Regions:
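Short N-terminal regulatory/linker segments that flank and modulate the kinase catalytic core
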Residues: 1-80
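Conserved ATP-binding/catalytic core of the eukaryotic-like protein kinase fold
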Residues: 13, 67-153
């Protein structure tokens, strides 16, 4: 998909739910002031302004610039950036929407869910991680699914 223009980018951002309408309106005004009006015609400049103001992350901006507006939320968590990807899953930095606690979320790809052995292995991993309690081992807080997307916090 070609890079969106400014109008399409703003529409994608609204549809994503990452920024509320008032925040977006204020950010657009400020971005145009800061760039002497250039942000209204340059989608990359607008995205950079939103990132520098902390309204979206670089990873979120890149996804929006690819024309994507879905996949930024898993239940009560907002995905901020991808930390890594392996053969079985991907790990993201996320933030709890209400508590603003940053966590790592391991997500099992939807195509792996169809294979019951992968899902069972994912659940066993979550149970094993939850049973461990040591200062040098990452603690597992939750395992859940959202519209068929299985994840561990």
């Amino acid at each position: 998909m070609p890079k969106p223009n400014v109008e399409t980018f703003v529409d994608l951002l609204e549809r994503s739910g990452l920024v509320d309408k008032d925040q977006l309106t204020d950010a657009l005004i400020e971005a145009n002031k800061a760039t002497e009006g250039r942000a209204q015609d340059d989608v990359d400049l607008l995205a950079e302004q939103l990132v520098s103001r902390g309204l979206i992350t670089r990873w979120q901006a890149d996804r929006l610039l690819e024309g994507r507006y879905k996949g930024f939320f898993l239940k009560q968590y907002k995905l901020l950036s991808q930390l890594g990807r392996g053969g079985m899953s991907a790990v993201y930095l996320a933030e709890h929407v209400l508590m603003h606690r940053r966590v790592a979320i391991k997500i099992l790809p939807k195509d792996r869910v169809a294979d019951s052995s992968y899902l069972a292995r994912f659940h066993r991993e979550a149970q094993a991680a939850a049973a461990l309690d040591h200062r040098n081992i990452v603690r597992a807080y939750d395992v859940d699914q959202d519209n068929g997307q299985h994840f561990m916090v």
